[in-house]
């Protein structure tokens, strides 16, 4: 419920620096929360079976199993680019999760871009 309230606050004509900072911080933290939740979800899928797997990290890795930073990297790359980079997906469940994450990220990033353009246009017009 905080994000719609923050977006509504950005749309008002008389907004101060505190309100603008609050709305911007809320949007940034909600963006990060989405990708952190997907990172935890991918970690759960990776370690759910008797033998961990489902993601193939680059061959230069020195550790045997992925840690949370690996999943954060994987998730935030999807969140920023709506695609995977150097991590191979070898499990159907994780592939479906990554597909949903990519679609949600694309929609979210498009909405944020539109919002920022609207804010910039209204600031220039004022």
Describe the function of each predicted region.
Residues 31, 36-48, 55-57, 71, ...:
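Broad hydrophobic/π-residue packing in well-ordered secondary structure
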Residues 13, 17, 79-87, 100:
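General secondary-structure edge motif
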Residues 70, 74-77, 89-125:
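Pore domain of cation channels
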Residues 44-91:
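Membrane-proximal soluble regions of multi-pass membrane proteins
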Residues 1-39:
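Long, highly hydrophobic alpha-helical transmembrane signal-anchor segments
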